[in-house]
């Protein structure tokens, strides 16, 4: 334990916070191009076919991103907007694709939580 005079001379070293989404480089979102669109299976105890895409970002990083919602129109060379946010049961997936932005269509027939899935307000 340092003395008061040692602390005055040197101070305490601050521990740098590690980013949860380093490929975004402090940006809220980044644009990218899909290089591969596929499905993968989650960790135990869950079971499903989760839709994911490999995306090359404008800064050169290549990341694995999750495609949220039911159904999607993405294929190779689709231009997408990527945000942070991991998927707990998919190891290595630390980013989400923003639905309803750029080439990604919003989720069809979605009535609740529409803003999260890029769905327009339904007609009366």
UniProtKB/Swiss-Prot annotation:
Keyword rRNA-binding assigned: yes
Gene Ontology cellular-component terms listed: small ribosomal subunit
According to the UniProt record, list the residues that bear 3-methylthioaspartic acid: 89
User: Which range is the signal sequence, renumbered to this chain?
Assistant: none
Region annotation (Disordered) ranges = 103-124
**What Pfam families does the record point to?**
Ribosom_S12_S23
* Record-linked InterPro entries: NA-bd_OB-fold (IPR012340), Ribosomal_uS12 (IPR006032), Ribosomal_uS12_bac (IPR005679)
| Recorded GO MF terms | rRNA binding; structural constituent of ribosome; tRNA binding
Q: Where is the composition biased (Basic residues)?
A: 111-124
Keyword list, A-Z: Methylation, Ribonucleoprotein, Ribosomal protein, RNA-binding, rRNA-binding, tRNA-binding
Query: Gene3D superfamilies this protein is in?
Result: Nucleic acid-binding proteins (2.40.50.140)
Which Gene Ontology terms describe the biological processes this protein takes part in? translation
Keyword Oxidoreductase assigned: no
What does it do?
With S4 and S5 plays an important role in translational accuracy.
Report the sequence similarity comment from the record: Belongs to the universal ribosomal protein uS12 family.
UniProt-listed NCBIfam families: rpsL_bact
Quaternary structure, from the entry: Part of the 30S ribosomal subunit. Contacts proteins S8 and S17. May interact with IF1 in the 30S initiation complex.
Against HAMAP family, the record matches this protein to: Ribosomal_uS12_B
What this protein is called in its record is Small ribosomal subunit protein uS12
Phylogenetic lineage: Bacteria, Bacillati, Bacillota, Clostridia, Thermoanaerobacterales
């Amino acid at each position: 334990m340092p003395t008061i005079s040692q602390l005055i001379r040197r101070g305490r070293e601050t521990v740098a916070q590690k980013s949860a989404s380093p490929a975004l480089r402090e940006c809220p979102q980044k644009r990218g191009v899909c290089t591969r669109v596929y499905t993968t299976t989650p960790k135990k105890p869950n079971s499903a076919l989760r839709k994911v895409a490999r995306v090359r970002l404008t800064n050169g990083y290549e990341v694995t991103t999750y495609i949220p919602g039911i159904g999607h129109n993405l294929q190779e060379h689709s231009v997408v907007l990527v945000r942070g946010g991991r998927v707990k049961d998919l190891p290595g997936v630390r980013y989400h694709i923003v639905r309803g932005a750029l080439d990604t269509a919003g989720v069809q027939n979605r009535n609740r939580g529409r803003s999260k899935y890029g769905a327009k307000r339904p007609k009366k």
